[in-house]
A protein has these predicted regions:
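Non-catalytic terminal extensions of PLP-dependent enzymes
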Residues: 1-121, 247, 297-305, 309, ...
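Conserved phosphate/anionic-ligand binding catalytic regions in large, soluble enzymes, centered on
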Residues: 58-79, 126-134, 265-280, 313-324, ...
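Short, flexible loop/turn elements at secondary-structure junctions
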Residues: 71, 129, 162, 210, ...
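Conserved PLP-enzyme active-site core in the AAT-like
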Residues: 102-105, 132-296, 304, 379-380, ...
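Long, K/E/R/D-enriched contiguous segments that form extended
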Residues: 108-112, 118-121, 126-137, 141
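General small-molecule cofactor/ligand-binding pocket signal
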Residues: 124, 178-180, 397
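Short amphipathic alpha-helical face segments that pack within enzyme cores
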Residues: 135-136, 140, 280, 317, ...
Length: 471
């Protein structure tokens, strides 16, 4: 398939603006020395080009998308319809408060909903993504300790099964990351946690349920120990879909949390955004909240605010979509978690007789296959199985994560998939298993039916071509 630059023909493009009859000359300094390399192509050819590209990709509208820890659920179209209402799309963030009262009311209502779901006292919608929400929460923790004169607390504890953004966010916030072990059951090793708690502990970052799909049975003890050591507890809300409406993070000892509107609350993934990672916090952290807060038509800033995390209010239209979703679901929001957990356990039970499950117990919203025993016998890897699934019209699960499971396949079906879809996926996994032992090369050479076949990973790493070269 040709690149759009290769389809470009000089002169085929058309100026957007008509010629101006007012003489004008810009200073030379801001002008380009050479013409920009922009493709010149007709509108219908451009439409065909990107439609063809879309057909070469796989999204939630194309088929099953069990990407673990990503909650690739259906994005209801009513969300898009509401977010496209002119009353929302034509707003400008610099408008006077009295002209955007409807938008402010929506933000206030959504904050109230999320506080009810999490048990927290307040929410900032400024963070534009999950990791951005983590960073915001850690800055709140840091501001809290510094306000108390507790400058020695410079360590954030994370488990070895944590999302990679956790230590990255801690580093960005100026903390040293302390990694603790998981126990044989896949949850936090309490003894290792105790050994690393101390006067330098600023907090603990924890996903619960964690990345192997298990809810930590010792969570109350874990948060108590951190608090007794003087630290705060941060809840990574990436897996909130497993417990929404059933467990409130604040009730199990957490002080601050980020949520992914583009996961749990059904707003779209992909395309580089926009995402939204609102950060909720308990009342004692409210004095440090970022951005401006609108109450009764007046904008105020928290007295000890950490400042702005982004411009204005955050990604407002994403909030509209999440708000629509929650109004649609209503008080039965707990059914999301129930069905997500049911679907994951159904798949796990149907596959555990042939695939080694990393932690063979009732899971939450996702489960992890540890393919290492099979790989040692056949040299068919988790990557090979993931590639083979593409030939069945299934997006691969997350692979090689969490790091505590060798040859990991992390599978999250979400609550929006039907039993028929799950059964088709289960059958695909079982057929691939048979091929692993009877025709391993067919799996190792997969996929065979996709527009792009298996790449030469070694060549791509050693001789990358990352940009189009113009003559």
């Amino acid at each position: 398939m040709k690149l759009i630059f290769e389809k470009s023909i000089p002169g085929r493009g058309q100026d957007i603006f008509p010629a101006c009859d007012v003489p004008c000359k810009l200073p030379d300094a801001p002008l380009r020395e050479k013409k920009a390399h922009l493709p010149e192509i007709s509108e219908n050819e451009m439409g065909r080009h990107y439609t063809a590209l879309a057909k070469r990709a796989h999204g939630v509208n194309d088929g099953f998308y069990p990407l673990g820890s990503c909650t690739m659920k259906h994005n209801p179209r009513i969300n898009e319809k509401m977010a496209s209402l002119p009353g929302f799309t034509k707003l400008h963030p610099l408008q006077p408060a009295h002209t955007v009262e409807g938008a402010n009311e929506l933000i206030a209502d959504l904050e109230r909903f999320l506080c009810e779901i999490t048990g927290m006292a307040g929410v900032t919608f400024q963070p534009a993504a999950g990791a951005h929400g983590e960073f915001t929460g850690l800055l709140l923790i840091k501001a809290y300790h510094h306000d108390r004169g507790d400058f020695e607390r410079n360590e954030i504890i994370v488990p070895d099964a944590a999302h990679g953004t956790n230590p990255a966010s801690a580093t960005m916030a100026g903390y040293k990351t302390i990694v603790i072990k998981s126990n044989e059951n896949g949850t936090v090793d309490i003894d290792d946690l105790k050994a690393h708690l101390g006067p330098k502990t600023a907090g603990l970052m924890l996903t619960n349920p964690n990345t192997v799909g298990l809810f930590d049975p010792n969570i109350m003890e874990i948060t108590r120990l951190v608090h007794e050591a003087g630290g705060l507890c941060y809840y990574d809300g990436a897996n909130l879909n497993a417990v929404i409406g059933i467990v409130r993070p604040a009730d199990i000892g957490f002080d601050v949390i980020h949520m992914n509107l583009h996961k749990t609350f059904s707003t779209p993934h992909g395309g580089g955004g926009p995402g939204s990672g609102p950060c909720a916090y308990k009342d004692f952290l409210a004095p440090f909240a970022p951005g401006l807060v609108c109450k009764d038509g007046e904008y105020t800033r928290a007295e000890k605010s950490i400042g702005n995390m982004t411009g204005f209010y955050g990604n407002f239209l994403v909030m509209v979509k999440a708000y629509t979703y929650l109004l649609t679901i209503g008080k039965e929001v707990y059914t999301l978690a129930q069905n997500a957990v049911l679907n994951a356990n159904y798949m796990q039970e149907k596959l555990k007789d042939i695939y080694p499950i990393a932690f063979d117990t009732t899971c939450m919203h996702e489960f992890v296959i540890g393919l290492d025993p099979i790989y040692r016998k056949t040299h068919v890897s988790a990557l090979d199985v993931a590639k083979a699934l593409l030939d069945y019209g299934i997006h691969p699960p997350t692979i090689y994560f969490p790091l505590i499971v060798h040859e990991a396949l992390m599978i999250e079906p979400t609550e929006t998939e039907t039993k028929e879809t799950l059964d088709e996926a289960i059958q695909a996994f079982r057929e691939i298993y048979d091929r692993i032992f009877n025709a391993p090369e067919s799996v190792q050479n997969a996929p065979q039916t996709t527009p792009v076949l298996r790449l030469d990973d070694t060549k791509a790493a050693r001789d990358p071509h990352l940009r189009y070269t113009f003559e």
